Amino acid sequence: MGGTSKGERRRQALVDAAAELLREGGFDAVRHRAVAERAGLPLASTTYYFGSLEELGCAAVEHSSRAELATGRRRLDELASAPRAAAELVELVLDLLLGAESRGGGLDAVLLRYEQLVGAGRRPYLAPLMRSMRPELDELLTESLARYDRAVDLDELRRLVALVDGAVVSALIEADPDPRAAARQMLLAAIGD
């Protein structure tokens, strides 16, 4: 299972490729052939380094999630020295919940993300990963709010996340061209200055 440096690099290239495909096209885009082609590796490498497509997909989700958490942590550290405006906090929270790709507005990035989140419920192999990563996201969100003098407990945090999710789902149902803007408006009203 690839214990060598070369093997580790190849495995990581497959994970990177699968994560890119996941971001671009959701779970349906993560296929052995597509991942191998994106990574520039032979098709057989996907089954050599991963026992199943589910294992590869799980590695892609974890890789993407950890990268987003690391980016969120860096942004929080960068913003710590800046003036503390509610709008900055809201954008950070929305990046963590909706993904930075949603910043440019538009329906597609948010729709794809929510399809992936809801679709995870149909992929039981992702449940342990999602459960294990949720506290990390909650911790970063809680710390973000606290640094902006808006301390919340876990129940309050879950209500804010549900508020964002509700605003986004309503916007998606209505084919709103900018669901992030709808979530921004609701979140600003909830935590405003």
Q: Where does each model-flagged region fall?
A:
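N-terminal intrinsically disordered/low-complexity leader segments
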Residues: M1-R9
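Generic hydrophobic, amphipathic alpha-helix propensity
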Residues: R9-A19, V35, A60-S64, E68, ...
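Hydrophobic/aromatic residues within well-ordered alpha-helical segments
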Residues: R10, L53, A60, S64, ...
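Solvent-exposed, amphipathic alpha-helical segments
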Residues: A13, A17-G25, T71, R75-E78, ...
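Helix-turn-helix
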Residues: A13, L21-A59
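Amphipathic alpha-helical packing segments from all-alpha helical-bundle domains
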Residues: L69-A70, G104-Y114, G121-Y148, D155-R158, ...
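Hydrophobic alpha-helical connector segments
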Residues: A70-V110, L157-L160
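Hydrophobic/aromatic-rich alpha-helical bundle segments in the mid-to-C-terminal region
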Residues: L126-R131, A146-D193
